[in-house]
Amino acid sequence: MFSHDDARSRILAAACERVSAGGTAGASVRGIAADADVSPALVLHHFGSKDGLLAACDAHVLATISDFKSDALAQGPGMDLLGAVAQSSEIAAPLVRYLARRLVEGGAPVDELVDTMVADAHRYVRAGIENGVIRPSVHEQERTVLLTLWSLGALVLHHHVERLLGYSMLDGPEGVQRWSELGAEVLATGLLTPEAIGAARSQEATA
């Protein structure tokens, strides 16, 4: 998370909060500077421009989430996956809210953000395979993209998650853990019966 011991960290924290609340359009350099108790000139001194500040926010959010996931996977097959998710989501709730807002805005910076998350996810999956947590796949890259977009889609549609399931994914660990339990059930036990999978493959083979 952010250290508030220096001006740069305060600026990053203020920028993330502004983006979370009102998107990038509502995150003016002047407003961020006021929230961080610094001058607008100091914001530009550290980050060059508003775009530079947003890029730094993206990088910090990704690095923090990456650290959480890497620490969890390093525990190997005996890891408490859902516990790790709950603990990290409690710490990273402001960053999750930032991502949920940032992802809906589109554009090249968001494309780059998603591409980086897919690349990071591929690394986590490889580590999980090596540690015995995740099964290998002949479609490893495609599977990684699917899982990443599945997760990001839930963040973008968080309003409907709360409306239909009755809990928020953005306000702390409880909602994220409940969502993760549903996902873990699907991933661990599957959705289709072996007979249904066999029938689908037979149809593909004869198509």
Give residue spans per PLM region.
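Solvent-exposed, amphipathic alpha-helical segments
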Residues: R10, A14-A21, F68, Y98, ...
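Helix-turn-helix
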Residues: R10, A14, R18-G52, A56
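Amphipathic alpha-helical interaction segments
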Residues: R10, Y98, T116, H139-L149, ...
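Short, Lys/Arg-enriched anionic-surface-contact patches
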Residues: M1-R10
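Hydrophobic alpha-helical connector segments
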Residues: A56, D67-A100, E140, T144
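Amphipathic alpha-helical segments used for helix-helix packing
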Residues: P77, Q87-V118, H122, H159-R163
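Amphipathic alpha-helical packing segments from all-alpha helical-bundle domains
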Residues: I65-S70, G107-V133, E142
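C-terminal peripheral helix-coil segments that are non-catalytic and often amphipathic
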Residues: A119, R123, A127-N131, V156-A207
